[in-house]
From Swiss-Prot:
Residue span(s) of domain Galectin: 5-133
CDD domains: GLECT (cd00070)
List of residues that carry Phosphoserine: 138
Gene Ontology molecular function: carbohydrate binding
Pfam families, alphabetized: Gal-bind_lectin
Gene: GRIFIN
Keyword Phosphoprotein: yes
Organism name: Homo sapiens (Human)
Official protein name in the record: Grifin
Subunit description: Homodimer.
Keywords: Lectin, Phosphoprotein
């Protein structure tokens, strides 16, 4: 899998920010994941859409092992189609959205949240935009 994008979060993650990933699902292969990383090598949040099962999986890697997976059957990707995934977070949860859907809510298992200092997006699909930015106000029913 090719490394498409990396970002360093000076001071670590803080509530009020979001990660936006837009691209084109070139094939039906499971070759797309986003990882929120700590300096220790742990992964505070791992999100992986799985075309093979039409699910989105969330997990965390702590102390050398994966925790229990959280699986969502809301699948925002289709082969040959553009996609948009937004990840935001607060002190308690990571929130994953696709247009018109809340895909997943995953508990923050790593404390403190600010210990998460890097974001890495791995993908063999074509990514048009990967942006780490302050979240603006949103009017509508997206849940935030």
């Amino acid at each position: 899998m090719a490394v498409q994008s990396k970002a360093f979060c000076a001071g670590g993650l803080a509530p009020g920010w979001k990660l936006l990933v837009q691209g084109h699902a070139d094939s039906g292969e499971d070759r797309f994941e986003t990882n929120f990383l700590l300096e220790t090598g742990d992964i505070a949040f791992h999100i992986k859409p799985r075309f093979s099962s039409a699910t989105v999986v969330g997990n965390a890697f702590q102390y050398g092992r994966w925790g229990p997976e959280q699986v969502s059957s809301i699948f925002p990707l289709a082969p040959g189609e553009p996609f948009e995934i937004e990840v935001s977070w607060d002190a308690e949860h990571f929130h994953v959205y696709a247009p018109e859907h809340k895909v997943l809510q995953f508990p923050c298992r790593q404390r403190p949240l600010g210990a998460t200092t890097r974001v890495r997006v791995l993908s063999d699909h074509c990514l048009a935009q990967v942006e780490l930015a302050k979240r603006g106000l949103s009017w509508g029913d997206r849940g935030y």
